Structure formats: C-alpha cells, structure tokens
C-alpha cells in the first residue's frame, strides 16, 4: 500500500498526511525545477523523516544532481543502491478484491486531512468505468492529465494503463512558453485525450494566452476538465 503528496505541500503538509499512516519508506527526488527555478527537496525530506519515527529509510532519486549529498538526512540511501546486487525474481501474487491499494486524503479545509483508504478491486472498476464509458479511452490513445501526485487525478491517470493507453507525463509549470506549453504538447506528443485542472486552463484563457486556433483538434478529442 502506498500514498503520495506533492512537493508544494511543504514539510508540514506532508507530515499532516504521512504522519497518520506510519510509513516505513519515504521516496523523494533530491529536488525539482519549476518555471526555471531549481527547488531543493532534501532539507524538507530530512524534516519529514525526523518528524515521523516510523520511517526506516529515505530513498532519494537523483534529479537535480547525479550524486546528491545525503549527509543531512539520516536513514537516506540512493535509488541506485536499491537496485544493486542480485535481486530476486519479480513475483506477482494474487490479491483479494478488497485489499488496500493506496491512501488518499481529504482537502484539509476543516482540520488535518483525513485518510481515505482505496481498495484494489473497487478502485479499478470505478476507474475502468470512467475511462471506458465516460471518456472512451482505448489502447490507441495517448492520455495526458496535468496534475501533481498529490491530487486524486494522478491515481485516475495511472489507471489509464489498464485500458492500454499510453500515458504522457509533464513535470513543470503549465504557464511556460507564455502559457502555451501544455497546448503545444498536444501537437508535439500527439496527445489524443487532454485534461487539465480548470484553474490552469482558465487562467491562461483569461490572460488571453491561449488561442483556440493554436490547437490542432484533428489530433486531440475534447478535453476533460
């Protein structure tokens, strides 16, 4: 069972969520780039690990640097070290329909975010219904949803693999290239199902940054909001 949150939640936002579920492993990148700015994540990861005693190891994935300095994080290991040596053969074991899959959280507008456990079978059936019947996603599609891994739409996007669709992922600001970055991706990546949060598209439209004439609708089907 796993859970995720976005780097923009900050240290306390992550602790408010992860502190309730007693995680044993914390995975983090050493940092990220947003709108041209390099943002370090190691100090935040160190604070999170110190605040949650259940965490046994912090696994760091290099992104800003090929060799991140891990000295300030106790229990830290590099992702590459987890892959070294003789690894056992990957085994897929049958699970029960109601076994837990991941934990999402409420918005936190009325206090600390509440944990919401999602089961394997129910989640897959619900997502498959929405992908197949509501969105008509198939193995011929290239599926994109602009979302962080802290929003439930990330989980919804990943389930598109069950429909055989190819997933297109984007890491960065939606307002790069004067607001055209995501729209340009439709042509560049041949995206057939494009979706984004209402606020990100509306902000660009209101600023008159996106012209409908810029979009090749022969490639992409109507967007999902």
Name every feature range the model reports, one short phrase each.
Residues 12-13, 18, 24-27, 95-99, ...:
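Hydrophobic, small-residue-rich alpha-helical packing segments that form membrane-like cores
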Residues 1-81, 198-200, 218-222:
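Structural core segment of the AMP-binding/adenylate-forming
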Residues 77, 165, 192-193, 206-225:
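Gly/Ser/Thr-rich phosphate-binding loop
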């Amino acid at each position: 069972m796993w859970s995720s949150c976005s780097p923009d939640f900050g240290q306390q936002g992550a602790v408010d969520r992860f502190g309730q579920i007693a995680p044993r492993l914390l995975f983090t990148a050493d940092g990220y780039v947003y709108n041209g700015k390099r943002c370090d994540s190691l100090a935040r990861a160190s604070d999170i690990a110190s605040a949650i005693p259940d965490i046994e190891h912090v696994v760091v994935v290099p992104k800003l640097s090929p060799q991140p300095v891990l000295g300030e994080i106790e229990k830290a290991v590099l992702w590459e070290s987890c892959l070294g040596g003789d690894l056992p053969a990957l085994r897929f074991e049958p699970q029960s329909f109601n076994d837990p899959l991941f934990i999402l959280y409420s918005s936190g507008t009325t206090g600390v975010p509440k944990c919401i456990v999602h089961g394997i079978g129910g989640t897959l059936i619900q997502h498959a219904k929405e992908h197949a019947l509501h969105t008509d996603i198939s193995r011929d599609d290239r599926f994109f949803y602009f979302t962080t891994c802290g929003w439930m739409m990330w989980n919804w996007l990943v389930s598109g693999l069950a429909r055989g669709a190819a997933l297109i992922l984007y890491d960065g600001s939606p307002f790069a290239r004067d607001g055209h970055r995501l729209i340009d991706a439709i042509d560049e990546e041949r995206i057939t199902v494009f979706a984004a949060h209402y606020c990100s598209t509306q902000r660009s439209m209101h600023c008159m940054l996106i012209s409908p004439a810029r979009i090749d609708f022969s490639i992409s089907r109507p967007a999902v909001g």
